[in-house]
């Protein structure tokens, strides 16, 4: 029995964003590839319990998080200057979305609004270096 999977991509060449496909675990094949959301370099994605989609996103050369409805309509982008985020996670219990920016050493926190949009809440920046 096939499973529906979603995945983000790098979009420098032919790819256009976030895709859906059918995965057959018996054969290891993908079929019925479909673009569900156009977004620059959505390399990490996460879904909320309501089905809203959150992805690493970009807008006008800035990096951040993009939000989409359960049927993949764009809601909003929350972005800032500099390198794009590389990780996004949804905390449905606390109604928060977390993003990580390895280049800046940051963890960013966003509030999940009732309609699925995001608003920036806080950030923590790591100071220092490795061992």
Where are these regions (language model features)?
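Conserved beta-strand positions in repeat-built beta-propeller and related beta-rich domains
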Residues: 7-11, 55-59, 99-103
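WD40 beta-propeller blade-start loop/N-cap
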Residues: 37-38, 80
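Structural motif
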Residues: 14-19, 62-66, 106-110
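Residue-level detector of Asp-centered blade-edge/turn motifs that repeat once per structural unit
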Residues: 1, 47-50, 90-94
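Asp-box/WD-like beta-propeller blade repeats and closely related beta-sheet repeat scaffolds
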Residues: 72-131
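Blade-edge beta-strand/turn elements of extracellular beta-propeller
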Residues: 25-35, 71-77, 118
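An edge-strand/N-cap motif at the start of beta-rich repeat modules
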Residues: 1-13, 17-22
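Beta-rich catalytic cores
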Residues: 14, 40-43, 84-86
């Amino acid at each position: 029995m096939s499973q529906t999977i979603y995945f983000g991509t790098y979009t420098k060449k032919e790819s256009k964003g976030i895709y859906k496909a059918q995965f057959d675990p018996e054969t290891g094949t993908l079929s019925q590839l479909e673009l569900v959301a156009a977004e620059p370099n959505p390399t990490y994605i996460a879904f909320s319990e309501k089905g809203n989609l959150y992805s690493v996103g970009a807008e006008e050369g800035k990096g951040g998080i993009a939000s989409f409805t359960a049927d993949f309509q764009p809601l909003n982008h929350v972005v800032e200057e500099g390198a794009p985020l590389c990780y996004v996670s949804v905390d449905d219990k606390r109604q928060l979305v977390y993003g990580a920016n390895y280049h800046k050493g940051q963890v960013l926190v966003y509030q999940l609004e009732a309609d699925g949009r995001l608003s920036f809440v806080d950030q923590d920046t790591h100071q220092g270096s490795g061992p």
